[in-house]
């Protein structure tokens, strides 16, 4: 199969299925304190995971589009992860593989694109700005680069507000699987302008 380097690519037909620096800034929060031992202990346990995978449902909603897909996310921190999107029939629509030496994306036609920046590639291929680097943390229920967030009564992440360039991302957590150790999200939503991305995690496997 031909391999192409991402430069300036047209919007893929299946693309819609995808999913001020200051060193003294401190996390802004309401509710339970992020300095509480409970939150610090939970965050430490999540960060100690050496591998995780989850599968579930993905939805993208905007003023002009409303689409859905099944997703599979496999992550081996700090630099390896795989995102697979499939249609209701189980066929692959898009696959992203990120490794220390680069990123490869394969579309539903089997065409491959390689590059260094997963977020940039997704934006070029789909026209959508998806905060993949932080989403790897958000999907686990930790704030990533965000310094503004709130905790619920169980000392679990409830909301995040994150500014990336000229975009503001608002993340909200609807539910967690508290039978897992550590507890992990089962439903979350990202909102940026007219974009709304919903993720529902049906199951988790962690190490």
From Swiss-Prot:
N-palmitoyl cysteine-type lipidated residues: 22
Keyword Thylakoid in record: no
Keyword list, A-Z: Cell outer membrane, Chaperone, Lipoprotein, Membrane, Palmitate, Protein transport, Signal, Transport
Gene3D superfamilies: Lipoprotein localisation LolA/LolB/LppX
Matching InterPro entries: LolA/LolB/LppX (IPR029046), OM_lipoprot_LolB (IPR004565)
BP terms from Gene Ontology: lipoprotein localization to outer membrane; protein transport
Signal peptide residues on this chain, from the entry's feature table: 1-21
Subcellular location, record wording: Cell outer membrane
Pfam families: LolB (PF03550)
Protein's membrane topology: Lipid-anchor
Self-association and partners: Monomer.
Protein name as catalogued: Outer-membrane lipoprotein LolB
Cellular-component GO terms for this entry: cell outer membrane
Protein family (similarity comment): Belongs to the LolB family.
Chain's role: Plays a critical role in the incorporation of lipoproteins in the outer membrane after they are released by the LolA protein.
Gene: lolB
Lipid-anchored residues (S-diacylglycerol cysteine): 22
